[in-house]
Amino acid sequence: MSSHTATKYDVFLSFRGHDTRHNFISFLYKELVRRSIRTFKDDKELENGQRFSPELKSPIEVSRFAVVVVSENYAASSWCLDELVTIMDFEKKGSITVMPIFYGVEPNHVRWQTGVLAEQFKKHASREDPEKVLKWRQALTNFAQLSGDCSGDDDSKLVDKIANEISNKKTIYATI
């Protein structure tokens, strides 16, 4: 990872609140904080149709890792998709490491935007600028090509795995 603006957060959490805020994300956040991993989690409950806030670009920019939890309704949110475009732009520049988590969705469904994601993009296409929708699709495709983890029956094991991986990488970066 190339050097960039001073790191304020070790981790930026990107997730669809409706799907994961009160279960998986709350457990993951608690474990990261317990391990003294500085973590940014947007605690705002968003209204349907609310747009991505430019203020969120800053926490992304000053984070080492982005843990992106794509769940069934992630792509239904223009906010989440705008956030993902920003994250993937920083990833492309080498200024953030993206850790994909496929929560209750198959990576291939995300990569090819099939199944429920196809329906979500059909809705976006009817009300959004085609260029914006194309950016969202490309960001999701690029994201799904990264090596990541899939949720299973045991969220606690996945939480431990993610926290261990970040702790180990954080230690490596500290020695560079």
Curated annotation (Swiss-Prot):
Its main location: cytoplasm. Mostly present in shoots. Keywords: Cytoplasm, NAD, Plant defense, Receptor. One of its GO terms (molecular function) is NAD+ nucleosidase activity, cyclic ADP-ribose generating. GO terms for biological process: defense response; signal transduction. InterPro entries: TIR_dom (IPR000157), Toll_tir_struct_dom_sf (IPR035897). Disulfide bonds: none annotated. It is found in: Cytoplasm. One of its GO terms (cellular component) is cytoplasm. It comes from the Eukaryota. Residues 7-170 form the TIR domain. It holds the Pfam family TIR. Interacts with MED37E. Disease resistance protein. Resistance proteins guard the plant against pathogens that contain an appropriate avirulence protein via a direct or indirect interaction with this avirulence protein. That triggers a defense system including the hypersensitive response, which restricts the pathogen growth. This is Toll/interleukin-1 receptor-like protein. The gene is TIR.
